[in-house]
Design a protein with these regions (language model features):
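Structured domain cores in non-transmembrane regions
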Residues: 50-119
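Compositionally biased, intrinsically disordered low-complexity regions enriched in proline and serine
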Residues: 15, 27, 77, 85, ...
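Ordered hydrophobic segments in well-structured contexts
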Residues: 22-28, 38-45, 70-74, 173-184
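N-terminal ordered "arm"
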Residues: 2-63
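Short, surface-exposed acidic
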Residues: 67-69, 106, 121, 149-158
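Conserved aromatic
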Residues: 46-52, 129-133, 159
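Acidic, proline/glycine-rich low-complexity IDRs
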Residues: 2-14, 21, 33, 139-184
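Extracytoplasmic/secretory-pathway segments with low complexity and glycosylation-like composition
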Residues: 106-147, 182-184
Length: 184
């Protein structure tokens, strides 16, 4: 009967290909950094790792020359800064980075996090209203979706102050950040 042999991939198979713009971290250790090596490690692609356990296994394999490596994530690329920490990456953070990577509207999500402090993707999706050139453009959209001013007001509709309506909307109900609109 044949024997099944599990062959692990080499650390090099998980290295970042910077051209693909995948989320990656430069993985070193505090021991090497504070010792003779200085900054020594490799860029590891979180996408190629696929999950947190594989990522941690790759990191520890990379630094298998140390008895108990204290991992140091010395740099990062292609994911929001708020998810970066030099000293640790937990499974929840790894999963958030991967969820963000899979999004079509990453820039809007980053603007949402900056505006609200909330990094929950479901909250973002619930509160994201789209991309607009200005607060006034969004206000015009809201009025157009909800009311027929021409029918309601006739020729007086041209006197409606969309700018003032926009100020009211964005003073309490909405955020406008980098061209993106979010409910509060």
């Amino acid at each position: 009967m044949g024997k099944l042999i599990f062959q692990k991939m080499a650390v090099e198979d998980y290295q970042s290909d910077h051209d693909l713009e995948e989320p990656s971290v430069y993985v070193g250790t505090y021991g090497k950094y504070n010792g003779e090596w200085g900054i020594w490690g490799k860029w590891i692609s979180l996408v190629k790792c696929g999950d947190y356990d594989t990522f941690m296994e790759v990191c520890h394999t990379l630094h298998a020359d140390e008895e108990d490596p204290e991992l140091m994530f010395q740099d990062y690329e292609n994911f929001p800064e708020r998810f970066y920490s030099e000293s640790c990456m937990d499974e929840d953070t790894f999963d958030k980075i991967m969820e963000c990577y899979d999004m079509d509207d990453k820039e809007a999500f980053e603007a949402y996090m900056d505006a609200t402090g909330d990094d929950d993707v479901d909250s973002f999706r619930e509160n994201y209203m789209g991309e607009w050139n200005s607060e006034k453009d969004f206000a015009e959209h809201v009025i157009g979706e909800c009311y027929d001013l021409d029918r309601m007001m006739g020729h007086l509709a041209s006197y409606f102050d969309y700018g003032r309506f926009a100020r009211d909307l964005f003073s309490e109900d909405y955020h406008y950040t980098d061209g993106y609109v979010f409910r509060r």
